[in-house]
Amino acid sequence: MDTAVVYADLHLARTGEPKREPPPSLSPDTCQCPRWHRLALKLGCACLILLVLSVIGLGVLVLTLLQKPLIQNSPADVQENRTKTTDSPAKLKCPKDWHSHQDKCFHVSQTSITWKGSLADCGGKGATLLLVQDQEELRFLRNLTKRISSSFWIGLSYTLSDEKWKWINGSTLNSDALNITGDTEKDSCASVSQDKVLSESCDSDNIWICQKELKRESTCNDS
């Protein structure tokens, strides 16, 4: 009987003690949140850097494409272009002993003959007797012959049938542009001195000037 009482008291005493609750444990989510935040921040920064680099690369690519020609030259075209750049351009050239001025070549004779003789001589050279184009050309030719005392024949003569001065190409003289001094007879031809255009006999002897167009010659090197 006593033993049972003692056991009951002990049991009550133990069961009457307050229970100590274990400290609350942190959930796994609570511990991992800061790490996820850091990871997300790193990933965001990495993505931003990649985006910036992609934009820069795309800009460089677009700029490169804009600078390229739409049609690329073939190797044959490139070689042809190189050949053209190494060749000398075509230039205008007068024959030896001829003088160039604007688009003409002029040859001054060293002897004196009649007007018809000078006409024939120029024809033999593949040229024509001088046809004065304008006053500027006339000044050039006078300067070219200023050391020669004789006047020079030009391709202008008086035709009795028309009673007009005509050039050898058939055109009529414009008297406002060129004034002829001297008597006009049935056999009159025009010559030029340093200060006048003279009417004189076609059988007189004068030097003469032939003219021809400048000849275009290519100076490309053959290889």
UniProtKB/Swiss-Prot annotation:
Q: Where does this protein chiefly localize?
A: membrane
Q: Which cysteines are joined by disulfide bonds?
A: C122-C210, C189-C202
Spell out where the chain crosses the membrane: 46-66
Topology relative to the membrane, per the entry? Single-pass type II membrane protein
**Topological region Extracellular:** 67-223
Q: Does the keyword Heme apply?
A: no
Task: Name a single GO biological process.
Answer: regulation of natural killer cell mediated cytotoxicity
Question: Does the keyword section mention Acetylation?
Answer: no
Q: Where, per UniProt, does this protein localize?
A: Membrane
Q: Which Pfam families match?
A: Lectin_C
Domain spans labelled C-type lectin: 101-211
Signal peptide limits: none
Query: Keywords in UniProt for this one?
Result: Disulfide bond, Lectin, Membrane, Receptor, Signal-anchor, Transmembrane, Transmembrane helix
> From the UniProt record, which GO molecular function terms apply?
carbohydrate binding; identical protein binding; protein homodimerization activity; signaling receptor activity
Record-level GO cellular component terms: cell surface; external side of plasma membrane; plasma membrane
Q: Where is this motif: LCK-binding motif?
A: 31-34
Tissue expression as described in the entry:
Expressed in a subset of natural killer cells.
Map motif ITIM motif onto the chain.
Answer: 5-10
**Residue spans, topological domain Cytoplasmic:** 1-45
Taxonomic superkingdom: Eukaryota
Its biological purpose is as follows: Receptor for CLEC2D/OCIL. Ligand-binding contributes to inhibition of cytotoxic natural killer (NK) cells. May mediate MHC class I-independent 'missing-self' recognition of allografts, tumor cells and virus-infected cells.
Q: How does it assemble?
A: Homodimer; disulfide-linked. Interacts with tyrosine kinase LCK. Binds PTPN6/SHP-1 in a phosphorylation-dependent manner.
Q: What is known of its domains?
A: Contains 1 copy of a cytoplasmic motif that is referred to as the immunoreceptor tyrosine-based inhibitor motif (ITIM). The phosphorylated ITIM motif can bind the SH2 domain of several SH2-containing phosphatases leading to down-regulation of cell activation.
Q: What is this protein called?
A: Killer cell lectin-like receptor subfamily B member 1B allele A
Taxonomically, what lineage is the organism?
Answer: Eukaryota, Metazoa, Chordata, Craniata, Vertebrata
